[in-house]
Amino acid sequence: MQQDKVNLLGLNQKAIEDFFISIGEKKFHARQVFKWIHKKGVIDFDAMTDLGKNLRHKLKEKAQITIPKVVFSKASKDGTHKWLIDVGGSAVETVFIPEEGRGTLCVSSQVGCTLNCSFCSTGKQGFNRNLSAAEVIAQLWIAARTLSKTDGEHDFTVTNIVMMGMGEPLMNFENVVPAMDIMMDDLAYGLSRRKVTLSTSGVVPRIYDLLEQSGVSLAVSLHAPNDMLRNEIVPINKKYNIDELLEACKLYAQKGPHKHITFEYTLMEEVNDNLSDAEELVALLKSREVPAKINLIPFNPYPGTPYKKPSNNRIHRFKEFLQHNGFVTTVRKTRGDDIDAACGQLAGDVMDKTNRKQRYLKKLGDTNAN
């Protein structure tokens, strides 16, 4: 029985070294291949010119470097890029957002999501499966290859990663952490821990694990100033409440790379955007002594949602109150609306479990027909 070939794409440096030792080869050859894949973007063993012929032949027998297919990609007039990537009959989306002096890649970790936050379009798809480490890092590999040129107006260079795409990354810990290891490896993409941010809805035990095993920057999707409201819109709060979450955040801020936690707060009209909500949020964060920056995200409506985007006046009032009380506060700019890439639209068409594959196959067929 033929043994399945190992996909080297998702192996971090230690794992690829272990693989090479298992096939009777030396560690330094593993580092050579690792660098070819991620630093140089080469996935053909025969093109790895510093490897001997016998080693290249052995690798072709025992290993492969498999990149998922891009079903389609779109570029917005504001420079935002979005890719729909085939992951074995389903699809995930990856978004690149260029800004002055930086380029941020938003990476997905699951097909769908397990957490079912009431306002999130991805949650309406239901949950299919976790992505493999190879499927996670492939999103950066694809983006880095695609964005290696400049169009004269935008500088398309990935300088920052945010694990804020489809899915809850801490529910796919075993695959996300090795992928982030590759992102931060100097032989690969060389990003610092400060430049890789994982966003979680509050899987508290895994926050402690993340601090111990990775220590990347942490963002927390808070969205509510009290347990009653958060139980309703972020259901995982029923398992790990705000007190438990903020206790973990306080420790992470003490030992993590930024010495603060970024709290994301999606503003929904007459749900959590009242001045009383802002007052409660300030009191909460001050009483728990969590060093915090706050990123306000105006809700982006999608078909079938009951929630609405607040007026600019309400958004400004909320922001001003937080700033007046000493919190560094930003309002996320809406980007990529013309390609459905803005935050809250990562699911594109809202797909549930029953029609996700049919719509995916239709898009694949339409793409192949063009």
UniProtKB/Swiss-Prot annotation:
InterPro entries: Aldolase_TIM, Elp3/MiaA/NifB-like_rSAM, Methyltransferase_A, RlmN_N, RNA_MTrfase_RlmN, rRNA_lsu_MTrfase_RlmN/Cfr, rSAM. Disulfide bonds join 106-343. Its cofactor is [4Fe-4S] cluster. Its EC number is 2.1.1.192. Signal peptide: none annotated. Its main location: cytoplasm. Binds 1 [4Fe-4S] cluster. The cluster is coordinated with 3 cysteines and an exchangeable S-adenosyl-L-methionine. S-adenosyl-L-methionine binds at residues 167-168, 199, 221-223, 300. The keyword Transferase applies. Keywords: 4Fe-4S, Cytoplasm, Disulfide bond, Iron, Iron-sulfur, Metal-binding, Methyltransferase, rRNA processing, S-adenosyl-L-methionine, Transferase, tRNA processing. It catalyses: adenosine(2503) in 23S rRNA + 2 reduced [2Fe-2S]-[ferredoxin] + 2 S-adenosyl-L-methionine = 2-methyladenosine(2503) in 23S rRNA + 5'-deoxyadenosine + L-methionine + 2 oxidized [2Fe-2S]-[ferredoxin] + S-adenosyl-L-homocysteine; adenosine(37) in tRNA + 2 reduced [2Fe-2S]-[ferredoxin] + 2 S-adenosyl-L-methionine = 2-methyladenosine(37) in tRNA + 5'-deoxyadenosine + L-methionine + 2 oxidized [2Fe-2S]-[ferredoxin] + S-adenosyl-L-homocysteine. It is found in: Cytoplasm. Residues 99-337 form the Radical SAM core domain. [4Fe-4S] cluster binds at residues 113, 117, 120. Pfam families: Radical_SAM (PF04055), RlmN_N (PF21016). Specifically methylates position 2 of adenine 2503 in 23S rRNA and position 2 of adenine 37 in tRNAs. m2A2503 modification seems to play a crucial role in the proofreading step occurring at the peptidyl transferase center and thus would serve to optimize ribosomal fidelity. NCBIfam families: rRNA_mod_RlmN (TIGR00048). This is Dual-specificity RNA methyltransferase RlmN. It comes from Francisella tularensis subsp. novicida (strain U112).
